[in-house]
Amino acid sequence: MSFAGKRYWLVGASEGLGLALAQALSREGAEVILSARSAEGLAVACAGVPRSRSVVVDVADSASVTRAAQAVGDIDGLVFLAGVYWPMTAQAVKPEQLEAMCDINFTGCARVVAAVLPKM
């Protein structure tokens, strides 16, 4: 499969697996749009990835996702890597953290997919 000339949006790509994937796709000729909550982290990440640009997004905020999807434009592929995790036991559930994990890890993904699927 050739990635040359393709555009990929990587959400949660300012570090770790997302950044590594952005670097790999770029090496294969793809244009990559990196997104995360931190503009500063994205600036550092994009500096090391040719054919990249950044769009800040908070996947827990529907308006932010809508704005980001509009800024990203048409894409050939989407990779959702955003996520948070706070370990907790069933005996010590922290409702606010549990809700945040669900909102970012699951609902956030659904928000992003819903925003870009009509354009793909």
Placement of each model-derived feature along the sequence:
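Conserved glycine-rich cofactor-binding loop
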Residues: 14-15
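N-terminal Rossmann-fold NAD(P) dinucleotide-binding loop
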Residues: 18-19
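Conserved glycine-rich Rossmann-like NAD(P)H-binding loop of the short-chain dehydrogenase/reductase
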Residues: 28-45
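The beta1-alpha1 cofactor-binding region of Rossmann-like NAD(H)/NADP(H)-dependent oxidoreductases
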Residues: 56-67, 95
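Conserved NAD(P)H cofactor-binding loop of Rossmann-fold oxidoreductase domains
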Residues: 82-87
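Substrate-binding pocket helix/loop in short-chain dehydrogenase/reductase
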Residues: 89-90, 94-102
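A short, exposed helix-loop element centered on a Lys and neighboring polar residues
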Residues: 113-114
